[in-house]
Amino acid sequence: MSSEVTALPEAAIECRNAAKAFQLYLRRNDQLAQALFGWWKQFYKEHWVLQDITFQVKRGECIGIVGRNGAGKTTLLQILCGITQPTRGTVSVNGRLAPILALGSAFDGSLTGRENAMIGGAILGLKRKEIEARLPSIVEFAEIGMFFDQPMKLYSSGMVARLAFAICAHVDADILIVDEALSVGDEFFAAKCQKFIDDFAKTGTIIVVSHGLDSLAHMCSRVMWIDEGRVREFGEPKTVIEHYRATVNAADAAEEEAA
């Protein structure tokens, strides 16, 4: 009998030549025409939001992603989380991934917070008994009290975000995907979220998108700058952020002069 233990891949995430295009239909009936006659003619234009994205994230790394609005950051996160698939290229995720805040978009407003927590935990890979055992800790972390057993259509956006964060914080994830998660509540709750992320970063893998450049420079081992759907720079945090900040400032100054 072999006593070998299969080692986990060194890379937590590997992205090779990933690209994403969306179909743009310019006329009202083009989508129907595509469904009926797409074999004969293309009735849409391709809008490429990501092009040739290649990178590797090692286990235990904290990677920051920066870029202006519309650069493709959210689409990249959606691909990593499995919400959408790349049009071409490959993405490999090795380990249990918890997409903080993205989970909130999957909640059913007609169900209670408790019911959505059960479903969310199952989506993230927990068994029913495991989820049930963690519900008290989840509701305590989320700080939503009696609303936990109320339909989520009664929740504010902040309460939805709190519950999503709380669920992701209790699923024993290997990888966290964080998209501006620290803007989900008051300073006390934001501090609680930051502490969880700091503790997780000691052993886990994190990808975080944030406009808080100083925070990224402090917590990340590397930073990726996405510009117009492509990786413009990926490396030492302070260097990448300095280049990104200079470019943004120059662009803003040019816009002010033109106004």
Where on the chain are the PLM-derived regions?
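The feature captures the beta-strand-to-loop junction immediately N-terminal to the Walker
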Residues: 66-68
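Conserved ABC ATPase "signature" region
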Residues: 33-37, 98, 118, 130-147, ...
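Conserved H-loop
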Residues: 212-218
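Pre-NBD coupling/linker segments of ABC/ABC-like ATPases
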Residues: 1-51, 237-259
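Helical segment within the ABC ATPase nucleotide-binding domain
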Residues: 190-202
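Conserved catalytic segment of ABC-fold P-loop ATPases
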Residues: 218-225
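Conserved ABC ATPase "signature" C-loop
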Residues: 228-229, 244
